[in-house]
A protein has these predicted regions:
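Domain-level signature for soluble enzymes in the chorismate/prephenate branch of the shikimate pathway
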Residues: 195, 205-299
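Receiver (REC) domain switch/active-site residues of two-component response regulators
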Residues: 46-47, 167, 223
């Protein structure tokens, strides 16, 4: 809720949120960036606090907040840092958890990028997915408003988050979005939000059926084959590394590397795969090949 301009917000938000809580009986939440914010919110009886993306990116600021929270166990949500750094995100949870807080949750709001063609902040879904793998008990919420940056993207992003098994959503809503003092383009009216939520398909994490189990066995077989082929490729790469060492050749052969990326990208496209995906796969393979050849040359 944008109830006051930025200069007045620090003074009025406490009283406004208290009023909202009293009149509606709803839980209220707000962002904190300093120890002073924490003390004011605790004094006002705010139910939930969240740490913003720019604050998460600053370990010193997170530690200041953690120190201010010692002795209480209020729910704390932590947005991902602006840059795609999972370890930095996890580090923020560790700092807050070490202060004695146990009710923690994550907010995925996307990552800053120069590429603004579609999203305001790139989703990079693999990062929150890896967070879930690393900390499976941690609730993860999606912020489609900040990811999309445009209200027409809110609905599809909400559904995508639900399809990926996110635990909830944090959506910006305003009674008159075009008049909002900040982020107007990404806000929706309460009626539109209600419409979006009612259209959501919530899928279940069902138990494995016999047919699904068979398909997963096929995936396991494919993965085993991929590992074996990669191991064979790395053996050949090490032989090439030995040859380069004996003939005083540089490890990086740019022409050959570009040829591989171009040809494999084209092959992938013919097989129905995205060329950018294939490029990333072979970039990772090349990086490991270079690492292994470096070990050989430096022996």
């Amino acid at each position: 809720l944008h109830l006051c301009d930025r200069r007045q917000r620090q003074m009025c938000i406490r009283d406004r949120l208290k009023r909202v809580k009293q009149e509606t009986g709803m839980y209220v939440a707000t962002e904190v960036a300093t120890a002073k914010h924490v003390y004011e919110c605790l004094k006002a009886g705010i139910d939930v606090l969240w740490i913003g993306a720019r604050t998460t990116a600053n370990p010193f600021a997170v530690q200041e907040i953690a120190d201010a929270l010692k002795g209480v166990d209020i729910p704390i949500l932590i947005k991902n840092p602006v840059n795609p750094d999972l370890e930095l995100w996890i580090g923020a949870f560790e700092r807050i958890n070490n202060a004695g807080l146990k009710q923690l949750g994550a907010i995925h709001r996307g990552f800053s990028s120069y590429d603004k063609k579609i999203y305001r902040n790139l989703p990079q879904w693999h990062i929150p997915i890896e967070l879930r793998r690393r900390i499976p008990e941690l609730p993860i919420f999606c912020d489609p408003s900040h990811i999309g940056g445009k209200r027409e993207l809110v609905a599809p992003l909400c559904q995508q988050a639900m399809d990926l098994g996110f635990d909830g959503l944090i959506v910006e809503s305003h009674c008159n979005p075009d008049c909002a003092w900040s982020d107007a383009a990404q806000q929706v009216t309460p009626d539109v939000l209600d419409y979006i939520l009612n259209l959501l398909v919530i899928r279940k994490e069902t138990q494995t059926t016999e047919n699904l189990g068979e398909l997963r066995n096929q995936i396991d077989d494919c993965d085993n084959e991929i590992i074996e082929v990669l191991a064979k490729r790395m053996r050949v790469c090490r032989e090439i590394g030995t040859f380069k060492k004996e003939h005083d050749m540089t490890i990086l052969q740019t022409g050959r590397y570009n040829e591989i990326l171009d040809k494999r990208g084209a092959q992938g496209s013919l097989c129905g795969m995205d060329s950018e995906f294939i490029k990333k796969v072979f970039e990772a393979i090349h990086e490991e090949s270079v690492r292994q050849q470096m070990e050989i040359i430096n022996k």
